[in-house]
From Swiss-Prot:
Pfam families: UPRTase. The gene is upp. Allosterically activated by GTP. It catalyses: UMP + diphosphate = 5-phospho-alpha-D-ribose 1-diphosphate + uracil. GO terms for biological process: UMP salvage; uracil salvage. GO terms for molecular function: GTP binding; magnesium ion binding; uracil phosphoribosyltransferase activity. Its EC number is 2.4.2.9. Catalyzes the conversion of uracil and 5-phospho-alpha-D-ribose 1-diphosphate (PRPP) to UMP and diphosphate. Binds 1 Mg(2+) ion per subunit. The magnesium is bound as Mg-PRPP. This is Uracil phosphoribosyltransferase. It comes from the Bacteria. NCBIfam families: PRK00129.1 (NF001097), upp (TIGR01091).
Amino acid sequence: MYKNVFVIDHPLIQHKISLIRDENTGSKEFRELVEEIAMLMAYEVTRDLPLEEIEVKTPVAVAKTKVIAGKKLGIIPILRAGLGMVDGMLKLIPAAKVGHIGIYRDPETLKPVEYYCKLPSDIAERDLIVVDPMLATGGSACAAIHFLKERGAQNIKLVNLIAAPEGIEAVHRDHPEVPIYVASIDQGLNEHGYIVPGLGDAGDRLFGTK
């Protein structure tokens, strides 16, 4: 349906997505599940990393094997909800550097407002993975990607747990070359800009605050 969008439908991911949708799931379990889903998604997001062949000596003989070909990675959570996905990603790619972009959505205009930014100094040399649990209007994601490009970023991927078609279309319109990885594409947005059926406000549920 959508070009450059990858829906990761692994049974474990889909099971855990069902659990975080449940309004009865508390903050502690919600945080753990988001971390687990992010770790599982990282497996697919990094599937296209280049490899190089090396030789290693085993206790028995010399083996020809493969390792990742020196790619530098960066994980960029969009604050605050994106923080919930960082530790899961780092479990699979522990050498990645982590930057932060603080963008919130104005409740009246639904437009993104930037309030914080701290990025790796070598951002132009890294393949970046922008993480945010929800892709609703796409405003925050588009703004974050635009800001990263201004700083010299060349290769960017966007990873969301749940996306609305409106958000996907917005990212495609502004940044058509950026691949989007999601666990679910939902029906759309309600009049308040929330994803339906979604899971509510991911930041509130992660941290137990509104």
